[in-house]
Amino acid sequence: IYARYLLAEKPGAKIAVLYQNDDLGRDVLKGLKDGLGDKATMLVAAESYEVTEPTIDSHIINLKASGADTFISVTTPKSAVQAIRKVAEMGWKPLFIQGYASASIASVLKPAGFENAQGILSAYYAKDGADPQWDRDPGMQRFYAFLAKFAPDKSRSDISVVYGYGAAQAMVQVLTQAGDDLTRANVMRQAASLKNFVPDTVLPGVKLNTSADDFYPIEQLQMMRFEGERWVTFGPVISGEIGR
């Protein structure tokens, strides 16, 4: 997604990436390289960090020194907060893209300081429970009502809560498709047979699809920019599948 966006909007970008040294971080880095294709030389620096590191400041300093004008942060919430603060503290002004796993307003951007997060880009597939633009959305109204009734101690602005509700709806759909045949084989077969399923919490245009040879239900995201105290989506829903 990010590679596709940069190729279209900033084809001369010099990209630096910070990622956690685990399978997810390495997969994201590989996906970026694959997405850039023959333009992979746009990636000028990449640094991994260990989850046990108390601070990632030294990595940010190294990435800035690379001459990069575009910074992609594929980090956990704690490190994302540190990265946003450090970039602002150094006066570095790259095009800043924050991985969606740590794009929560409540747990990342607010602790990092809204003033430091202005203009940061990300991409996501779900509606933000903290964003008033969804207050009259029928799907989100059902989500809010569910929380009020069954989980009043949970925050609708918590990205993991939004994710959990949508994932639970997808599981209900799988079990509904399975009918009375709740064997493991049939449940797995139905999980690999989702067709254009739309949970209440996904952005308009995003649909869940799986097949026997494609187990990734969500392969679409929409770019968004942080403005004021909320995310503002822009542009079309983008497919992350290579070749599309």
Could you say what each language-model-derived stretch is?
Residues 139-143, 167, 182-190:
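Short amphipathic alpha-helical coupling segments at ligand-binding clamshell hinges
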Residues 1-91, 133-134, 138:
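Extracellular/periplasmic Venus flytrap/periplasmic-binding protein
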Residues 46-47, 235-237:
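Short hydrophobic alpha-helix segments
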Residues 87-163, 237-242:
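Extracellular/periplasmic periplasmic-binding protein-like sensory domains
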Residues 149-162, 172-233:
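Segments of small-molecule ligand-sensing domains
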Residues 43-48, 120-122, 223:
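Conserved beta-strand scaffold positions in the cores of enzyme catalytic domains, especially
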Residues 2, 6, 167-175:
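Buried hydrophobic packing segments
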Residues 9-10, 64-66, 89-91, 112-116, ...:
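Extracellular/periplasmic catalytic domains that process cell-envelope and extracellular macromolecules
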